[in-house]
Amino acid sequence: MRLLLAFTAALVLAGAAASATVKPPVIKYRDDRFGPILATPKKQALYYWTKENDFRIHCKGGCARLWPPLVVRSKAAVRVHVAGINGTFGTIRRPDGRLQLTFDRRPVYTYVHEGPTQVLCDDVNGWFVVRLRG
């Protein structure tokens, strides 16, 4: 019985340590024009599309090739809150079965023709860079 309890405690501690070391798939980045924005760890700006206001995925096929979704491996890899970022993270299942990151209930995307630190498509055809409060 003691061995079982010790083993269970070790598993719990290992799980807690593993989840504590999971790096968030996003960072807060300060853009000269837009102020604090949400970006990938490689400083690629993240966008949302105003046509996706019903918590359903509408950007698929050719749209998703131009606007690649920020996909995550599992819900467990996503923290609901990330230090220094005001807002709530979550996931939504895409039509292909992959999980896409959401921020304040909106699926987030990158733009394929942008490099790190670029913001080229804010307010273009309903796409907006994710601006952060504070």
Each model region followed by its residue ranges:
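Positively charged n-region of N-terminal signal peptides that target proteins for export
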Residues: 1-5
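Compact beta-sheet-dominated domain cores in extracellular/mature segments
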Residues: 19-134
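Bacterial N-terminal signal peptides
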Residues: 6-14
